[in-house]
Amino acid sequence: MCQNLGKFEIVVSHYRRVKAMNVIVDLCVVPLGVGVSVGQYVAACQKVLAEAGLKHTMHAYGTNIEGDWDEVFAAVKACHEAVHALGAPRITSSMRFGTRTDRPQTMDEKVKSVETWLENS
């Protein structure tokens, strides 16, 4: 499939050389049509993330996840599949995610960086 995509083609060909890309995701999965209590659905997604071997931290309105791009997004899909399997007819999810290529950085390092700024201010 060769198309003249101009600048985009250059970007795509550059990133094909990247072997792996880590990502940090903030994921919020909300099942619809299941009532107001969603704990069992959140628990199902947490199990999926644990079984995937991904580092994740649940918080009040979602879950932070870190790992290889393909593994993380495969787990997000598996979360949706698990929640649908529990009977949720519809799901809405929101994600914020970031990558960086200048150096590796974990969720813990990001938090520690801010804590250090707070301690020194």
UniProtKB/Swiss-Prot annotation:
Gene3D superfamilies: 3.30.70.930. It comes from the Bacteria. Pfam families: Thiamine_BP. InterPro entries: MTH1187/YkoF-like, Thiamine_BP, UPF0045_domain. NCBIfam families: MTH1187 family thiamine-binding protein. Belongs to the UPF0045 family. This is UPF0045 protein sll0230. The lineage of its organism: Bacteria, Bacillati, Cyanobacteriota, Cyanophyceae, Synechococcales.
